[in-house]
Curated annotation (Swiss-Prot):
Stated name of the protein: Glutamate 5-kinase
PANTHER family on file: GLUTAMATE 5-KINASE (PTHR43654), ISOPENTENYL PHOSPHATE KINASE (PTHR43654:SF1)
Main location: cytoplasm
Catalysed reactions, as listed in the record: L-glutamate + ATP = L-glutamyl 5-phosphate + ADP
Keyword hit for Flavoprotein: no
GO biological process: L-proline biosynthetic process
GO cellular component terms, semicolon-separated: cytosol
Lineage of the species this protein comes from: Bacteria, Bacillati, Bacillota, Clostridia, Eubacteriales
Residue sites binding ATP per the record: 14, 177-178, 219-225
GO molecular function: ATP binding; glutamate 5-kinase activity
Length: 269
């Protein structure tokens, strides 16, 4: 089953705020540098990668030296505007060191609702990838309240990453989180919880295992990851949920190693 991942040509990688920042909210430069190096190496293998990156608000909080996340929507959007600029500067610097060019793509939900805009976005992705450019995608937090309000919309970009996977016709979606995979109960509160290696169908029982919200640095929990898995697998895309603490895990996943939880695509449906 996992050996097929070796043949993945087009991959979407999603990293959340908790992967990109320390507990105190400051940017984890070492991890972003390693992530940039690993993705660059994957591209050097002849594969295409789209990076969906959260972290605009988290990085903005660190950049502005705020003690905590802002609470009002207008403050969050202002902080996101600062953070997105800083985040892209960091990505541009690190990917540039490995001779790769990146492009910023900021999306809002109306892209999905307007067929003309959707086609334009698809054409942009295709052109960037044809030219060997790595698209770095985020929701446009400065003008969109979907992720900020976290009302079952993109959800810390988990759902956005699945949607992007369908837009670019990806073979595989890899979501890097601060947890090793999908468990039958919360491993942070239940030491007897067991990680599921493969999920072939998202049943009501599986949904019940998802629990509630995620870490306090992001907005997505297991609920949004399951939602992303539904979108990806129903469109024939395998999804892997794994721990992003060491970005080199991406290489292992694409080598077909038994890492994280694999949500198996529904082929030919």
């Amino acid at each position: 089953m996992r050996k097929a991942l070796k043949d993945s040509k087009r991959i979407v990688v999603k990293v959340g705020t908790s992967t990109l920042t320390y507990e105190n909210g400051s940017v984890n430069l070492m991890r972003i540098e390693k992530l940039s190096r690993v993705i660059s190496d994957i591209c050097n293998m002849g594969k295409e990668v789209v990076l969906v990156s959260s972290g605009a608000i988290g990085v903005g909080v660190g950049k502005l030296r705020l003690e905590k996340k802002p609470e009002t929507i207008r403050e969050k959007q202002a902080v996101a505007a600062v953070g997105q600029c800083a985040l892209m500067h960091i990505y541009n610097k690190f990917f540039g060191e490995y001779s790769h060019v990146v492009a910023q793509v900021l999306l809002t939900r109306d892209v999905l609702e307007n067929e003309r805009m959707k086609n334009n976005v698809c054409n942009t992705f295709d052109t960037l990838l044809e030219k060997g450019i790595i698209p770095i995608v985020n929701e446009n937090d400065a003008i969109s309240i979907d992720e900020i309000q976290n009302i079952l919309n993109f959800g810390d970009n988990d759902n956005l990453s699945a949607i992007v996977s369908t837009l670019v016709n990806a073979d595989t979606l890899i979501i890097l989180s601060d947890i090793d995979g999908f468990y039958d109960s919360d491993p942070r509160t239940n030491e007897d919880s067991k990680m599921l290696k493969e999920v072939y169908e998202i049943t009501p029982e599986i949904e019940e295992c998802a629990g509630g919200a995620g870490s306090n640095r992001g907005t997505g929990g297991m609920v949004t990851k399951l939602s992303a898995a539904k979108v990806a697998t129903s469109n024939g895309i395998d999804m892997i949920l794994a721990n992003g603490e060491n970005p080199e895990i991406l290489i292992d996943i694409l080598n077909g190693e038994d890492i994280g939880t694999m949500f198996v695509a529904k082929k030919g449906e």
